[in-house]
Amino acid sequence: MRGHKDMSQIKAVISGVGLWTPEHSVTNDELVESYNAFAEKFNAEHVDSIADGSVEAKPLSSVEFIEKASGIKSRYVYVKEGILDPDRMTPNIPLRAEDELSDQAEISLKAAKKALTAAQKSATDVDAVIVSCAYTQRYYPAIAIEVQNALGIEGFGFDMLVACSSATFA
């Protein structure tokens, strides 16, 4: 893109792709055990409200239901701690300081480095960073800008935030 004045002469090339897969995973067995403990605790704590109809009981789940409904047997997770805690049911991801890379930028950076290696390119060969993500950890800066800065890429950065379809749009 550098040096081009006529946009018709720009040729976009994807010369490498990179993927980073988290080291942790949660199986359906683990998920069902944790969720059912959460549901049983909730139902026990709200027994009177459930009986009078003001609160709906949490149904129990099963491995078979999850696999039939989604086809998923296991899912990779960035941070496993907290996900299977029936009192929490969400990952425990500590907040980072504003001057640190966001968790999402750190993940993107790992994938970007793999893409550069696959393409046999360096950061100076890259004109644009496009990041697709379902949501962002911070309002500013954009994840693509964080990746650009971390790798020393010139050009532009763009976050494509299209919820669950982000990857398909990118």
Enumerate the predicted regions with their spans:
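Short glycine-rich or small-residue beta-strand-to-loop segments that form or flank ligand, phosphate
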Residues: 127-134
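A glycine- and small-aliphatic-rich helix-loop capping segment at beta-alpha/alpha-beta transitions
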Residues: 142-153
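Active-site-proximal alpha-helical scaffold in enzymes
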Residues: 161-170
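Secretory-pathway/luminal and periplasmic proteins that interact with or process carbohydrate-rich
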Residues: 135-141
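Conserved "HGTGT" condensation-loop signature of ketosynthase/thiolase-family condensing enzymes
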Residues: 2-125, 151
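Short pre-catalytic strand/loop immediately N-terminal to key active-site residues, enriched for Gly-Thr
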Residues: 155-161
